[in-house]
Every structure is written in C-alpha cells, then in structure tokens.
Amino acid sequence: MSPTLMFVLLLCGVAAESIRETETMDPTSMLEYESSGSFPDEVFDDDEIDEDDDYAIDEDDEDYSGSGTDKFDIDDNDEDEEEEETATLGNQIPELDFDQTKTGRKIETNEIDNEIWSPTKPKILEPSNEISMASTGSEGFFQRTEVIVAIVAGTLVGLVVAISFIVFLVIRRNQNGDLVKKPIYKKTSTMEV
C-alpha cells in the first residue's frame, strides 16, 4: 500500500468523525436563543425621545433622597397615633406528664417494661420514581455511552495510524534493500589458496 492511500484513508476517518459531530449540533437552532435581558432591535429605539412628560416633580420629593440622612419634619403629635398592643404568649412552659410515653400509654412507676411496643404497624415503603441527586453523581465515568464510543473511536484511529506507520517503514526499507539478508563477509574461494 502506498503512503498516500493510507493518508487518504486516515483523512476519510477524520472527515467522517467531524461530520458526525456537526450532525449532532444544529447551528440554526443556536441562533434562536437570546441571552437573558436581550431584546430585539425593534423594541427600543434610541432615536425616539418622549416630548411629553407623564410625571410631575413635587418640591417635597426633591428634599428627600430616600437614604434617611436628610432633614425632614417630624410630627410631635406621636401620642395621637394609636399604638397597637402586642399580645404576649407569656413565658409559661407547659408541664408534661412524664409518666406517659410517646404512645400515650400510662406507665406505672414500679412497672418494668422490657417489651418494645410500637403504636402503629410499620409502613411498607414503595420505591419511588424520583432519582436522588446523590445517585446521579455516582454514575461511573465509563458507564456513559459517549465515553465508550469516544474510547473505541480513538483506539481504532490509533490502530490505523500505527499500522500505516509500520507499513510505511516496511515499504521504505524494502525499496532501499535493507531487508535482504547480506552476509557480513564474503567467503574466499578455496582455489586461490
């Protein structure tokens, strides 16, 4: 095989991979999305200036900045305002009957109860369809199909490159005659002796 054929095959593999990548991404749909706060150009025109003011400025409003540091008139007639009395709940702590357990059963002070008593039957928990966030993060890296496909594709491309490199070296050495076994020295003929 010629090196150009190997290069063409490698180029076809790379092109096929890039075509697959562009099939998954639709560039026209990406242009439809606008970022948060962006408006089309037709909504706001900076050239138009409203000539008529719909609001009036009071002189009282100019005195106050809203920061609370300006001087303003305080009415001294605070007594006229009705003050609402707050209802206090008090600081009484309800006394609990310590002879009763959580179940409401009364226990005698001399009674020793070694029996574990449950007020209701245990509930049978049905498995939920909800996926907890902890279980989604525990998915292994190699369990994702995209990762496995990428590893297989990378391995195949690497294998093709390695095979083409070896074939290229064999062809080149064969052309130079390096692969033919040549003796290190020539035997002299016995007639000369």
UniProtKB/Swiss-Prot annotation:
GO biological processes: cell migration; convergent extension involved in gastrulation; neural tube closure; protein localization; Wnt signaling pathway
Q: Which UniProt keywords apply?
A: Developmental protein, Gastrulation, Glycoprotein, Heparan sulfate, Membrane, Proteoglycan, Signal, Transmembrane, Transmembrane helix, Wnt signaling pathway
Looking at the UniProt entry, the stretches that span the membrane are 151-171
Q: Which Pfam families match?
A: Syndecan
- Ranges in the topological domain labelled Cytoplasmic: 172-193
How this chain sits in the membrane, per its record, is:
Single-pass type I membrane protein
* Glycosylation, residue list: 36, 65, 67
Q: Which residues lie on this side of the membrane: Extracellular?
A: 17-150
Write out the GO MF terms: frizzled binding
PTM characteristics = O-glycosylated; contains both chondroitin sulfate and heparan sulfate. Ser-36, Ser-65 and Ser-67 can all be modified by either chondroitin sulfate or heparan sulfate, and the protein exists in forms that contain only chondroitin sulfate, only heparan sulfate and both chondroitin sulfate and heparan sulfate.
Q: A single GO CC term, please?
A: cell surface
Q: Which InterPro entries match?
A: Syndecan, Syndecan/Neurexin_dom
Please list the tissues where expression of this protein has been recorded. Expressed in the animal hemisphere from the 4-cell to the blastula stage. During gastrulation, expressed in the involuting dorsal mesoderm and ectoderm. After involution, localized mainly to the anterior neuroectoderm. At later stages, expressed in the brain, branchial arches, pronephros, tailbud, and at low levels in the somites.
Q: Does the keyword Amino-acid biosynthesis apply?
A: no
Q: Where in the cell is it found?
A: Membrane
* Keyword presence, Signal: yes
What are the boundaries of the signal sequence? 1-16
Return the annotated region ranges for Disordered: 23-90
Report the SS bond pairs.
Answer: none
Q: What does this protein do?
A: Cell surface proteoglycan. Regulates non-canonical Wnt signaling, being necessary and sufficient for fibronectrin-mediated translocation of dvl2/dsh to the plasma membrane. Required for proper convergent extension movements during gastrulation, which shape the neural plate, and for subsequent neural tube closure.
User: What is annotated about its quaternary structure and interactions?
Assistant: Interacts with the Wnt receptor fzd7 and its signal transducer dvl2/dsh.
Family listed: Belongs to the syndecan proteoglycan family.
Name-wise, this protein is: Syndecan 4-A
Organism equals Xenopus laevis (African clawed frog)
Q: Which gene encodes it?
A: sdc4-a
